[in-house]
Amino acid sequence: MKTQRGYTLIETLVAMLILVMLSASGLYGWQYWQQSQRLWQTASQARDYLLYLREDANWHNRDHSISVIREGTLWCLVSSAAGANTCHGSSPLVFVPRWPEVEMSDLTPSLAFFGLRNTAWAGHIRFKNSTGEWWLVVSPWGRLRLCQQGETEGCL
């Protein structure tokens, strides 16, 4: 740095190496954060969908049995009241996740909401991707909670 004409080749290469290392670690951290946000948003949107089904069952005094439809890598949650056999369409009784990398790995087969006394068949739905897992837990009284893997207290 004592030369009059600028930086030496070694100084430039060291600066470039530091810049590349910081950029690579920042890119990895950003991708991990983005994947974890997509997982959380999918679980939250599924919770909102189930809240809608619970309120609809109570308001119209009808039952909503939830099932999953898989079409290749695409999956969706469908209410029995929708009468749909596909993930395509714009029915509010069908939930299609925005991001295909979020998987639904487990669903209680008899998960349902009943209009009579606003009750539910207890169960859970598990969402996962490369960053972790979220559980959507339904109680017999229709309470919905989001729990992260390994979390025993403080479910949302």
Swiss-Prot record:
The keyword Membrane applies. The modification N-methyltyrosine is found at residue 7. The chain crosses the membrane at residues 7-29. GO terms for cellular component: membrane. Keywords: Membrane, Methylation, Transmembrane, Transmembrane helix. It is a single-pass membrane protein. This is Prepilin peptidase-dependent protein A.
